[in-house]
């Protein structure tokens, strides 16, 4: 019971922060699971990805009902992402824990930079059409699928800016496409992690409802709080956490 309560709180906090600044909860959930529950880095990545697939379904349904989605674009991204997500999960499994921690730290710093640049992304719209747009979407799936499987995150942090900048897709539609595309891709990555023994299933009972509630609360609060201040504070926290991970010492 105590473990379920702790995992619920971790999911809740991850969802709130993710909802506040428009990020998936994985970048918060993984450090919390490693720090509070003393989880192995590999298991934290696998468990996070499983939980995020469930919350991605809810988000995709919401965006679909609002009409902010492009099913064809989602299919194109998922077509390549389902293959690379499996490769990413296997690559993470093959890495020593200290190397995976360093890689995750670098990813957190990269995410923080994207977070700070977020207000300016919608003003740099690309104009790819036809075959070029298809190639952009397929290529986006290749990179974000691998990243999702390796880092245990949804991949939208990178996927959405890529679609906005390179394919000329609107911000809200890009977010909906990202959520829908990562259901099959994230599912493949999550299943691969589970097969490799990198999923702590008993934590999911608390994590999944916690993220659901937290994302809803975070999204609601986001409209009441100044966006710029939230992004800067969260980016600072991510950079600090990222540098701590990057400085993980190699075993002697």
Feature roles, as predicted:
Residues 9-19, 28, 188:
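N-terminal signal-anchor/start-transfer transmembrane helix
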């Amino acid at each position: 019971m105590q473990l379920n309560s702790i995992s619920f709180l971790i999911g809740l906090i991850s969802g709130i922060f993710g909802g506040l600044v428009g990020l998936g909860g994985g970048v918060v959930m993984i450090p919390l699971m490693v720090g509070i529950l003393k989880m192995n880095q590999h298991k934290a990545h696998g468990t996070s990805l499983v939980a995020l697939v469930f919350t991605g379904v809810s988000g995709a349904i919401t965006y679909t009902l609002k009409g902010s989605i492009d099913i064809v674009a989602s299919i194109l991204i998922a077509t390549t992402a389902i293959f690379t997500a499996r490769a990413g999960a296997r690559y993470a499994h093959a890495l020593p824990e200290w190397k995976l921690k360093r890689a995750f730290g670098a990813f957190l710093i990269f995410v923080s930079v994207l977070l700070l640049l977020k207000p300016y992304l919608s003003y740099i719209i690309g104009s790819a059409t036809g075959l070029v747009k298809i190639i952009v979407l397929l290529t986006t799936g290749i990179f974000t699928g691998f990243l999702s499987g390796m880092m245990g995150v949804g991949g939208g942090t990178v996927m959405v800016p890529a679609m906005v900048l390179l394919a000329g897709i609107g911000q809200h539609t890009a977010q909906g496409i990202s959520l829908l595309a990562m259901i099959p891709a994230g599912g493949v990555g999550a299943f691969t992690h589970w097969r490799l023994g990198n999923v702590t299933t008993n934590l999911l009972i608390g994590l999944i409802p916690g993220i659901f509630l937290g994302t809803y609360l975070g999204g609601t609060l986001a409209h009441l709080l100044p966006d710029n201040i939230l992004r800067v504070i969260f980016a600072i926290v991510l950079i600090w956490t990222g540098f701590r991970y990057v400085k993980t010492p190699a075993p002697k």
